[in-house]
Amino acid sequence: MKKFKIYCGGEFIETSKELDVVNPYSNSVFAKTYYASSENLETAISKAQQVQLDMQKLPSFKRYEALKYISDELKARIDYFAEILALESGKPMKYAKGEIMRSHQTFLVAAEECKRLPGEVMSLDWTPAGEGKHGVVRYFPVGLVAGIAPFNFPMNLAVHKLAPAIAAGCPIILKPSTNTPLSTLALAELIDETDLPKGAVSILPMDRKTGNQLVIDDRFKLLSFTGSPHVGWMMKADAGRKKVVLELGGNAGMIITKTADIDKAVATAVIGGFAYSGQVCIHAQRIYVAKEIFDEFSARFVKEVNKLKLGDPMDDDTQISSMIDEANAKRVEAWVDEAVSDGAKIICGGKREGTYYHPTVLIDTKPKMKVCSLEVFGPVVTLEPFASFEDAISEVNNSEFGLQAGVFTNDIHEMDYAFERLDVGGVIINDSPIFRVDHMPYGGVKDSGLGREGIKYAIMDMMEAKILVR
């Protein structure tokens, strides 16, 4: 059985406490790594502080070279990384390869952003006090960054913390999910092969108590967290004076109007609703369909959902595999059962087998049901008809979350209305809310988070403006 060392202060080390990594599909341990102790974390912090000035002074072209190298090697070694990711997360292999390619692209975007780090020369004589003076504005790294990544995209969502930190010149300590730590520890091998200062990056699986130091320790100047709203907002309350960026998920809505291309809407909704068993914070959880086409859309949607192939994530033909663990599968089962007892109807799925929960479609739901009001984070979609576009917008907004929404329409006025009125961080036209490319601003409002990811936007969060006046 392979053991992965953790990456602490620029060195690969073992510790006294092993961490078993379970394959969700087989429910068996397939590899081991180690928990970092509080002493290991202190070593990583100390080393990061020692190299902080070196990172700040590292020329942009050197940062570019490091990021470009990592990007190129991820693409070259895609099979190696995808296998690790699929085994630890239960993600079907074709989606695991897709995530590695996204990570390759995210590092590449970060490399390119190194060439355009902001700065400006400005005249100050707009008021009498500034006569004869000008300013030079530069952006400096904020300092040590703490990154906490989730299990569902264990590589790419970690890269969204690592890559901008390197581009900005910030040392970073990353805590991967203890369910899925191996892909980022494998990534550490590539980071270690670059010319970045040793200690600029540490990747440390930690238990909750040790990991909480990333939140409360004032030596960290920015905390970037991706995870549940409950945990994220507690972290913000405990984070003190450091900057905080939160990406916290949601229960994304999708609107299908009567002018929509139904063929495309059905195909897109199936992917948006059930990719990675719905364990995506922007999965199309609530779908609202114009009443004129509701019956046709529902029938065609269910027909396509029933075609999805369930199976071993290592099989290239598998489209749906297990959830991350049986506890989450049981939670989803309980939420669906509760909805049914309150009047909802299952028109597809509704069955659990161990860590599997079969793709499930519900109708006749009510807004206060958990499957509507909370983040299911599982393979469950609700379908409801709407009478007017304004009603559909109101239903999507009737949520504590506001990450992204999808709108299928060929009416430009409806597109503009949706963009103006939907209370979300992103409006996706003629696609599902699951759409994301890694350089766009990504984040939400309300309980869905604070701040934005997307390399350029993350880099700006990780830098501070300083002005020289003369």
Located regions from the model:
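Short, well-ordered beta-strand elements within core beta-sheets of diverse protein domains
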Residues: 30-36, 51-57, 147, 254-257, ...
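Hydrophobic face of amphipathic alpha-helices that form TPR/SEL1-like repeat modules
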Residues: 1-24
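Residue-level signal for inorganic ion chemistry
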Residues: 27, 63, 85, 107, ...
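A short hydrophobic/small-residue beta-strand
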Residues: 171-173, 346, 426
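Conserved C-terminal structural/oligomerization subdomain of aldehyde/semialdehyde dehydrogenase
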Residues: 28-32, 255, 309, 341, ...
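Rossmann-like NAD(P) dinucleotide-binding subdomain of oxidoreductase/dehydrogenase enzymes
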Residues: 123-264, 386
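ALDH superfamily catalytic-core signature
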Residues: 230-366, 429
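Glycine-rich loop-to-alpha-helix module at the N-terminal edge of alpha/beta enzyme cores
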Residues: 30-118
